[in-house]
Structures are given as C-alpha cells and as structure tokens.
C-alpha cells in the first residue's frame, strides 16, 4: 500500500489536534491517538486495525500495545487504495465491535460520512465546508475546510 499523501496527513494532524484541544479545554478524559496506533477490536493478540484517528474514553482499554476493545470514535481518511475497506469492511468491523461514532473523511470528494453507530445509521454526509456536529460530544462542531486553512 502506498504511503499517505500530504493532504491525508494534514487532515489527520489538524483533526487530531482540534479534538485533543477540545478535550483538554473541557477537562475531558478521552485520549486521541493518530495512526500508527494498534486497535485490537476483539481483545485478542492477533487481529488489529490502525485507524487514522482513534478516540478512547475508557482508559482501562489502553495498554502498551495500543487499545484492547472498541474506541469510542474512529476517523478514517479515505484514499483510492483504502476506500473499499473504509466504507465496507471497517464499517462492519467497527459497528460489530461497539464503536460509538465513525467518520469517513474523503479528500477526493471533499465529504465526510458520519455514522452514529449507537443508532446504527448514517447520520449524514457533509461537505468540508459544513459545520459537523460530533455525536459523542454535544458541544463540538468541526469544519474541515476551516481546519485546512
């Protein structure tokens, strides 16, 4: 697989920073981990995924290897080489494992699919210019275009 391009890295960096800043300002307990960071969804030692960004609120899931169990919020940044996996296999895996919120950020179409997995539905599809309400945080709105300025 090809390494992520510059825009992918910029989106990953600015999103992680924005979420981390919000958590710190609000004295939150969740932790933000950009890739590379192993997530063992089935709590075994063999099978893991590396989401572009993982937000974990239950610190008992964290150990030296990464996260054992489902993160609360996962963000994947789609590319031509990962699109099929991000929209198919990973959506199924994250839903089955108990991830609460899943975002697929697509730099090619400049859209963000937000899945509220507790409601088991696609909440909405947004453009980079939209203010996107985060499902797990009532007071957090993210605008990708603003982050990329």
Model-predicted regions and their roles:
Residues 1-149:
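Gly/Pro/Ser/Thr-rich low-complexity, intrinsically disordered segments predominantly at protein N-termini
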